Amino acid sequence: MVYLRYFKGLILSDAYAPGLKWSDELKAYSALAFKYRDVRKYFLEKEIEVEENVIDSLPFPLIKDKIELRDYQAEAVKAWLKEKRGIIVLPTGAGKTQVALKIVSIMKVATLIVVPTIDLITQWKERINKYLDFDPGIIGGGEDSLKGITVITYDSAYTRAEELGNKFPLLIFDEVHHLPSEGYSIMAQLFASPYRLGLTATPERDDGKHELYPILVGPIVYRKSVEELAGKYIAKYKIKKLYVSLTNEEKKRYDGLRKKLKDFLSSRGLKLQNLDDFHRLVKLAAKDKEAREALLAWHESLNIAVNSQSKIEKLREILQEYKNEKIIVFTRDTQMAYRISKTFLIPVVTYKTDKDEREEILQKFRDGEYRVIVASTVFDEGVDVPDATLAIVMGGYGTKRQFLQRLGRILRKKDKEALLIEIVTKGTADYRLSRRRRE
């Protein structure tokens, strides 16, 4: 017989299994708690009797399942249940939350739902109340209540992983693309939870760390793209690119800055073609004045390209042409968002906007009192944005994730074709960012 137990983010065993190492301090074989499922499976396959005190689960609450799934959502649930581990990839607006809560309802085990933002805590709480008729526990944003279904931020899960690591058999990671980052990946390894679900619209990461998914949460078990769902479950859509040029003054300034950057890179035998190259430049800039000036030149030239005055004029034309549509204008930074707000007298939402004001703006947009709003990256994740029929992206978004998140904001109503317009500055870094995102 083998005895397994949990201790502060570790599993301890009095017998060896692959993945365990002897600890003189603990007088036991040990491993990070996420190895629990594999270690237990090893002993059972060897027909070794296991006595364990690992999972000390909170009781599962009384719920009332009110979830009706679409065909693809039911397929996703079925795919995950085969191994009770893995990631479900669905576009923004395709109902990942309903899929997850159906799994919670089927599994009927204590569940910890890990989310990146306070706004997502609020969103999940509302959905759990709506679909499961249960008021969940909340950890984060000043609240600290533990229940059989609890929603927690990634940061709080990180700080309390050792304490909570054996309380929840089912672990759900919303926006799971955050998980492979250094601190959060350690957090996931401190939980013994044998059942794990990841949710995202965009699993790939620029740094390649999505390769850690199989270890931390499981492989991708189900995936549907925007294209596969458009028309039947979410709106049909078109993407239109409109090109503008820098003003003469902007072009002169832009060319000077790019020359400064190019000259520096050439003098040091460096390139700036990918993320690794950029990280090398940032590291060098920390100790080298010329590298720092080159990095500033890169940043300033990108700002000129992304926030060109020509884009403001093109936006004016678009707002006039589509004056009967509900429109969200997305900007790369808050400076451009406030500039557009001031120019066109449009309500603006950025990270500086307090929660009450933001909710008021969104509600008025939802009710039709506001027809156009402008937002910076605050809408990327965790904000329940009302339906819009037109999204205008003011450029500067090099990642596919950001682009798909913006597209998802206009795909919720399937009775009308949605349109996304991207305004791109020709012959600049803005153009190259746009091309990279489309590849």
Curated annotation (Swiss-Prot):
EC number from the UniProt entry: 5.6.2.4
Ranges spanned by the short sequence motif RED motif, renumbered to the chain: 205-207
Key words, A-Z: ATP-binding, DNA damage, DNA repair, DNA-binding, Helicase, Hydrolase, Isomerase, Nucleotide-binding
Renumbered residue ranges of the record's region DRD domain: 1-54
InterPro entries: ATP-dep_DNA_Helicase, Helicase/UvrB_N, Helicase_ATP-bd, Helicase_C-like, P-loop_NTPase, XPB_DRD
Segments crossing the lipid bilayer: none
Sites where the protein binds ATP: 90-97, 127
Residue span of motif DEAH box: 174-177
The family this protein is said to belong to: Belongs to the helicase family. RAD25/XPB subfamily.
Domain commentary: The C-terminus binds Bax1. The N- and C-terminal domains are joined by a flexible hinge region which allows the two domains to rotate and form either an open conformation or closed formation. The ThM region is involved in interactions with Bax1. In complex with a partially unwound DNA bubble substrate the ThM domain and RED motif contact the ds-ssDNA junction; both are important for binding to bubble DNA substrates. The DRD domain (residues 1-54) structurally resembles the mismatch recognition domain of MutS.
Quaternary structure note: Forms a heterodimer with Bax1.
Role noted for this protein: ATP-dependent DNA translocase which moves along double-stranded DNA (dsDNA) in a 3'-5' direction, unwinding the DNA. The ThM domain grips the resulting 3'-ssDNA tail and functions as a wedge (particularly Phe-278), breaking dsDNA base pairs, probably using the energy from ATP hydrolysis to move along dsDNA. A DNA-dependent ATPase; double-stranded DNA (dsDNA) stimulates the activity more than single-stranded DNA (ssDNA), while Bax1 stimulates ATPase more. In an in vitro assay had no detectable helicase activity. Binds ssDNA better than dsDNA.
UniProt-recorded name of the protein: DNA 3'-5' translocase XPB2
Organism of provenance: Sulfurisphaera tokodaii (strain DSM 16993 / JCM 10545 / NBRC 100140 / 7) (Sulfolobus tokodaii)
